[in-house]
Amino acid sequence: MNYLSKVTLKPSLNAKHLFVKEQINPEPRSLASNDAPKTDNPYRVHQALWQLFDLPAGSDRPFLYREYEQGGQTFYYVLSTLKPKLDHPFFTVQAKAFNPSFFVGQRLAFELRANPVSSLKNAQGKSSRHDVLMLAKKSMMSQGFDDAYSIDQAMFDAGVDWITSPERMQEWGVIIHPNLELSAYTQHRLRRTKQDLEQQEQAQDSMNNKPIKTKNKLIQFSSLDYAGALEIQDVDLFHNQMIKGFGKQKAFGCGLMLVRPLRQNNS
């Protein structure tokens, strides 16, 4: 059973302490202010949402999420393979079973925050991931283009090409219409705190020294928000991909596609 939950951050002082800004070069911010708490560090959010699930240390992540803010209130849509705890000191949780009735040819409006990367091999044949928008920018600059419009257009086209590639759409079981909105391109550079690293060591100890994937103190990734329309070609592929997540990065608010039906006369 899968669950789609709306998780709202409580306006409490403890919640503010949990989500203090921890991006590199943070701007000063008072924890005692009356402003709605801001979740400035996706790593902290990701760790906090883990607390909604009763799982032993070292377990696979059972959820995807996407952060929104409306009227000064921060909330998350969380898609999970386990039912979240409804009683949490930092969150108000509304959970319901996720069992959509998709059909071939169905048209859906979608929103997705993704990590658009491609794998390239170096001279030694070693493959590594690269941000497709940054690759497009560097390519334009290497060709002598320095005007913002041309570079922005090349980056936009790269973002569209990434999500509408035939191989990707076939893998996801959809056709994505190329008339897309792209926004909020962000390069994230996050630091794990000393406390986070100590917790990782404690988790490894609790697993009787069973190896846990090593995690660097610095986390770097990019994200891009997509909004548009798609048509389902393979129900099982699409449904399974929704549960797994879209794109390489499926943590830190990436990978969750939110959809709603489109009327037949909508584009």
Regions found by a protein language model. Name each.
Residues 1-267:
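RNA-interacting cores
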